[in-house]
Curated annotation (Swiss-Prot):
HAMAP family: Fapy_DNA_glycosyl. DNA binds at H94, R113, R156. This is Formamidopyrimidine-DNA glycosylase. NCBIfam families: fpg, PRK01103.1. Transmembrane segments: none annotated. One of its GO terms (biological process) is base-excision repair. It catalyses: Hydrolysis of DNA containing ring-opened 7-methylguanine residues, releasing 2,6-diamino-4-hydroxy-5-(N-methyl)formamidopyrimidine; 2'-deoxyribonucleotide-(2'-deoxyribose 5'-phosphate)-2'-deoxyribonucleotide-DNA = a 3'-end 2'-deoxyribonucleotide-(2,3-dehydro-2,3-deoxyribose 5'-phosphate)-DNA + a 5'-end 5'-phospho-2'-deoxyribonucleoside-DNA + H(+). Belongs to the FPG family.
Length: 277
């Protein structure tokens, strides 16, 4: 699933192309992709709308702001792609929506797993949408402070890996960047959140910011499905220390990376650097 760095990269790559363009028509091959409003209303409302200069993101949601106070809200889920391209580019097999633009180009939404969803809503309602209104702070915002992190760790008696995946705690983290942050902070993924020391919490806070920033710098992580809004792969997969590296040597100590299940999710870690305690 695209996480914060991937979604941020998509937003930035689309922003430079979509600004000022108008949607002239829509091809909708999978109506179930549209969450709200009703499909016929969605099509009627979005045709003729112009993309604003500044697009946005909240957690893993893309926010494509449009004229007349509307925003196209998109969650890519596991395998969604949103690509700006030439109209004559061969169609991907799992293309579900095509937005035709007034410069002759297209914005295409494709999704192999078919879990991705989009909604067209008044911009003022975006902060109140289910899935967004409950979100915690963005990891690169000042609201995600060391003090916030330490306070939340004390009051949530759950495994730290599970907590990092909770979007109500911090927005945008997923399996990849949670594992990388825990490794950087030398914290075992099964440690209980309130058991972390003040020093460990500070180290985790720093690690989260560093891995997210690095993920954005390298334009996200590509294994199979993820590409940005121009169809380009990311490169953060070449920077990974533990994620998806089971059996390979830890770059810090040389011990083999291990994989365990935490809350039903695969977690990669180094048993030497990240002690269970």
């Amino acid at each position: 699933m695209p996480e914060l760095p991937e979604v941020e990269t998509i937003v930035r790559s689309l922003e430079k192309h979509l600004s000022g363009l108008v949607i002239t028509s829509v091809d909708l091959f999978k109506p179930e992709v549209i969450r709200t409003p009703r499909v016929d209303i969605f099509t009627d409302q979005i045709v003729g709308r112009q993309f604003q200069k500044k697009l946005g993101r909240r957690g893993k949601y893309l926010l494509l702001h449009m004229s007349d106070g509307l925003t196209l809200v998109i969650h890519l889920r596991m395998t969604g792609r949103l690509i700006y391209c030439d109209a004559d580019l061969p169609l991907e097999k799992h293309t579900h929506v095509i937005f035709h633009l007034d410069n002759g180009k297209q914005l295409r939404f494709a999704d192999v797993r078919r879990f991705g969803r989009m909604s067209l809503v008044p911009t003022r309602e975006v902060p109140h949408l289910p899935g967004i209104k409950e979100m915690g702070p963005e990891p690169l915002d000042t609201a995600f402070s060391r003090e916030y992190l330490k306070k939340e760790l004390r009051r949530r008696r759950t495994r730290i890996k599970s907590l990092l995946l909770d979007q109500c705690f911090v927005a945008g983290l997923g399996n990849i960047y949670a594992d990388e942050a825990l490794h950087e902070a030398k914290i075992h993924p099964e440690r209980l959140a309130p058991d972390l020391t003040s020093r460990e919490a500070s180290g985790l806070h720093k690690a989260i910011i560093e891995v997210i920033s690095s993920g954005i710098k390298h334009r996200g992580t590509t294994f199979r499905d993820y590409v940005d809004g121009e169809g380009r792969s990311g490169s953060y997969q070449h920077q990974l220390k533990v994620y998806n590296r089971e059996g390979l040597p830890c770059p810090h100590c040389g011990k083999p990376i291990q994989r365990i299940k935490v809350a039903g999710r695969s977690s990669y870690y180094c048993s030497s650097c990240q002690k269970a305690k």
